[in-house]
Curated annotation (Swiss-Prot):
Stated name of the protein: Ribosomal RNA large subunit methyltransferase F
Similarity annotation: Belongs to the methyltransferase superfamily. METTL16/RlmF family.
CDD domains tied to this protein: AdoMet_MTases
Gene Ontology molecular-function annotations: 23S rRNA (adenine(1618)-N(6))-methyltransferase activity
Organism (species): Shewanella frigidimarina (strain NCIMB 400)
Amino acid sequence: MTRSTTPPMRAKHSSAKRSPSRSAAKVNPVSVKPNKPLLSKALHPRNAHLQGYDFATLIIAMPALAAFVRPNPYGNPSIDFADPKAVKSLNAALLLSEYHINGWDIPEGYLCPPVPGRVDYLHYIADLLAVKGKVVKGASIRGLDIGTGANGIYPLLGIQTYGWQFVASDIDPVSIDNVAKIAQQNEKITAHLQLRLQPQPEHIFKNIIAADERFDVTLCNPPFHSSLAEASEGSLRKVKNLAKNQQQKHGQQSRKLAVSQAKPTLNFGGQKAELWCQGGEQQFLANMIKQSRDYANQVLWFTSLVSKSDNLKPCYQLLKQLNAVEVKTIEMTQGNKATRILAWSFLTPAIHQQWATLRP
């Protein structure tokens, strides 16, 4: 089998300079108005949130959000992102107003994901699956979300944005039940989504992918931390960063208030499987890559978010050992946060072309 590995690249949507050893691309930076900072410095060009949040529209869609909206230092409406109730209300309003998702909610203590960053992943996946440069929409695309969580954010956004079909898996029955409740309130989502409980946490694809199934792509946002203590430290660090930003904008007193009022276990919370696992992100990725080899002919692209760039090198080494045919790293930036998508395939370019022609 011929192996053609693409080293790390930065995704973009204009011309890309290529060299024999590296494919690089950049998302064009968004211009920033001096008196109105954007939500992100480099969201995907198709991201609906490039210009930040339209709170007037969001409040019309969900009036309850108004209770959490206050002017930010620039005089524009915003919320306290250290307040878990405010963040959840914002998410529900965004999903209803922009993506027409009714009844989104999560149980207390479960992970509340930022919508702009999550939908960015899907936009880059759409580019990865594009045929002759054209994004494929509709039910011919089948995605598998590994560890969908109680929020079910990837299948919900993928269905509403691109019309894809999804299977969403999780080891937590509460998460599966909660996503089912959301789906029941949305006819299109019900028709495009299957939920599957993983009975064996050590397995990622086994028990989920049936022998006769094919998926165009798998998605995953793996647990980052290796222990509960490490996860708690990470949550506290996020709170301190928020407080530091508050201090820069409002002074020392505001920082003290932010730290004293913040509750990291809530806003930056999540259940065990959402936040940590033995060996952390690196071990989870290694397990996923090893197990993906058994489903090499049933999945066109395996993908995962990788939060820590240091975890990429061992992934590349393992994929080389397992004879992956193609490997891509798509870098993303949301505000000051950099992350990346690792994508790999065991199928040759010829099979990739054939796969596209066999889609219904």
